[in-house]
């Protein structure tokens, strides 16, 4: 089920290249550690293979359908505990923390120079103990609703979304990662709990640490937070829908009060096979080679004020 499991060979090669230690706990959680002598800080990231495109799955035989923006909304809610906001706990230790959601993953991270064990407990504890109520969800719906409206005022963000809506006719990628005000209004506590049961299982997650820390220290943190032992797993089945449809639109236009026109070009490629790192890197390079700042196309577009 896990994308991370499918990428184990790539992880092993990458880990060896950077001198990274790795282990898989009996619970299924993958722990990566890059001990860096001479460094005074520690960076940690706790990630799950759950992003905005994961909208349909079955949990213990029951189908679950999620509205757009669920993964991003859940990211916000995971940072809230009955005892308060996790970022306030980080502030007391002097750590810098953040979280983000992409199309295929959600990540929680911190960097710190002191109280590393305490910060690891905050990180693993908040993600491992979800807490949702109707009242807290309603409050967050208002907050994220304002965030969505703020991004609607960003020309670059709207341009990116317009490109995706041209590329995809009926695929979750065409929807904004944050969803819409209307879509997140559909969320309930049970929907979010279903997501944590399905995607926040240790076997679908990775803890990666680097800096002034050892692998044993990271594993001990997992033990303290109940992430070491094997546990009964929910039966989960999910798949990202295939997209074999032609382009939804060849072009799109919108108007906004901007100082200069915004212009974007997108090319629809075949889906990447999980673990095909070589092709992924080649596609990343292709953008620079075709429309990068040193290309003739870029200069021609620049000269025509595009």
Predicted regions, residues:
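His/Glu-rich zincin catalytic helix
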Residues: 1-86, 193-300
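Acidic/histidine-enriched segments that form metal/cofactor-coordinating
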Residues: 3, 82-195, 216, 243
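Short, intrinsically disordered, charge-balanced linker/junction segments flanking boundaries
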Residues: 303-306
């Amino acid at each position: 089920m896990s994308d991370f499991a499918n990428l184990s060979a790539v992880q092993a090669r990458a880990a060896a290249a950077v001198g990274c230690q790795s282990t898989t706990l009996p619970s299924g959680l993958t722990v990566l550690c890059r001990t860096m002598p001479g460094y005074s800080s520690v960076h940690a990231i706790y990630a799950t293979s759950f992003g905005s495109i994961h909208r349909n799955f079955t949990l213990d035989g029951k189908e679950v359908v999620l509205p757009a923006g669920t993964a991003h909304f859940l990211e916000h809610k995971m940072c809230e505990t009955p005892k308060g906001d996790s970022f306030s706990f980080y502030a007391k230790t002097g750590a810098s923390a953040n979280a983000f959601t992409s199309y295929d993953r959600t990540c929680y991270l911190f960097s710190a120079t002191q109280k590393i064990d305490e910060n690891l407990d905050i990180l693993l504890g908040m993600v491992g103990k979800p807490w949702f109520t109707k009242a807290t969800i309603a409050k967050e719906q208002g907050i994220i609703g304002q965030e969505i409206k703020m991004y609607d005022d960003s020309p670059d963000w709207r341009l990116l979304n317009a490109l995706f809506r041209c590329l995809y006719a009926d695929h979750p990628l065409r929807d904004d990662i944050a969803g819409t005000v209307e879509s997140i209004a559909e969320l309930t506590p049970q929907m979010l709990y279903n997501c944590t049961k399905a995607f926040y299982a240790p076997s679908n997650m990775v803890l990666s640490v680097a800096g002034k820390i050892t692998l044993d220290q990271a594993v001990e943190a997992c033990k303290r937070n109940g992430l070491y032992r094997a546990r009964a797993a929910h039966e989960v089945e999910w798949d990202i829908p295939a997209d074999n449809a032609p382009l939804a639109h060849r072009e799109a236009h919108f108007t906004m009060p901007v100082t200069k026109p915004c212009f974007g070009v997108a090319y629809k490629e075949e889906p990447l096979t999980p673990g095909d790192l070589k092709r992924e890197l080649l596609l990343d390079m292709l953008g620079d080679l075709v429309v990068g700042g040193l290309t003739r196309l870029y200069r021609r577009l620049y000269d025509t004020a595009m």
